[in-house]
């Protein structure tokens, strides 16, 4: 159905929101890692931050790509080009 179709620009807002959520979570994890005195917990928190970093980067890249996809002046990220 046509009303269920999402444009690339609308999709870019979803990617941006996802990136914002990931960024906030990473800030929370960094704070928790700084505040804990348990070395094992700190290690787990830091590891989780490292695992989230590529997801955040990808969400940011895809937000830009989908927002600018039809702009002829935009130089697309080769990582996402077929």
What residues fall within each predicted segment?
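Short, charged, amphipathic alpha-helical segments
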Residues: 13, 39-54
């Amino acid at each position: 159905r046509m009303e269920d179709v999402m444009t690339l620009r609308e999709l870019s807002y979803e990617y941006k929101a996802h990136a914002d959520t990931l960024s906030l979570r990473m800030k929370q994890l960094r704070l928790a890692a700084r505040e804990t005195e348990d070395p094992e917990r700190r290690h787990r928190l830091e590891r989780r931050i490292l695992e989230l970093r590529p997801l955040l980067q990808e969400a940011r890249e895809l937000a830009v790509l989908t927002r600018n996809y039809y702009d002829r002046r935009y130089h697309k990220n080769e990582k996402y080009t077929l």
